[in-house]
């Protein structure tokens, strides 16, 4: 068998304190997983449960590299999120066994073309153009789980040009990490190399080219990069 053209390279993420890298298989994302964020977007947490969507694996940006402001939007929003990196997968995974599949955690930014998302919601259409564009998933190095130490209660925060915009607790999530893995595995066969962006707290807003974005999660790591002009 001969390839018609050279296959695209696999996106990889570095591991903290290791020469190994994590090959990305798929990127799953959870929306509406913090009550305060659901409310700031005009929803009701009791009527709007968390939802799943995805991004292409090559949306990942690593090593604090600059991120290019995307075309076709005038309202680009940041969303800081805890990212789960899976070492193994399966289907119908129980809540009790879910964390056994986790390799580690990272800090991620789910960039969103908010104007396109609002229009998609109004029309009842998918969010692909709003969520799955190039460089829409900057991600820090992955911190490996050591001795079962899962950082599920620390602080998650984001600042723009030194001003804090998002500041919350991971324990504020509606669905916990084990519950997210359980729910996803009902719909998809999860695999090693999958990333799961677990949702963002309140405080999202627009950014422009020239802004410096920094985010941190206790016990996981940090990420910092500049948003640059196209």
Where in the sequence are the language-model features?
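Catalytic-core "active-site belt" of small-molecule-metabolizing enzymes
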Residues: 1-187, 191, 195, 203-230
């Amino acid at each position: 068998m001969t390839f018609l053209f050279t296959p695209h390279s696999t996106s990889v993420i570095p591991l903290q304190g290791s020469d190994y890298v994590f090959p990305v298989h798929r990127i799953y994302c959870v929306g509406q997983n913090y009550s305060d964020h659901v409310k700031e977007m005009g929803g009701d947490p009791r009527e709007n449960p968390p939802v799943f969507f995805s991004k292409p694996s090559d949306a990942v940006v690593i090593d604090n590299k600059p991120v290019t402001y995307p075309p076709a939007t005038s309202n680009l929003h940041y969303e800081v999120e805890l990212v789960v990196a899976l070492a193994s997968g399966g289907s119908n995974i129980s809540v009790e066994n879910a964390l056994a599949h986790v390799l580690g955690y990272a800090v991620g930014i789910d960039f969103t073309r908010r104007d396109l998302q609002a229009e998609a919601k109004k029309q009842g259409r998918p969010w692909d153009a709003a969520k799955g564009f190039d460089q829409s998933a900057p991600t820090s190095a992955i911190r490996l789980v050591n001795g079962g130490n899962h950082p599920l209660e620390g602080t998650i925060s984001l600042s723009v040009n030194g001003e804090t915009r998002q500041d919350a607790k991971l324990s504020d999530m509606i669905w916990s990490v084990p519950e997210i893995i359980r729910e996803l595995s009902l719909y998809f066969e999860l695999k090693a190399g999958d990333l799961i962006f677990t949702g963002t707290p309140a405080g999202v807003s627009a950014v422009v080219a020239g802004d410096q974005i920094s985010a941190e999660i206790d016990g996981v790591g940090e990420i910092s990069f500049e948003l640059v002009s196209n």
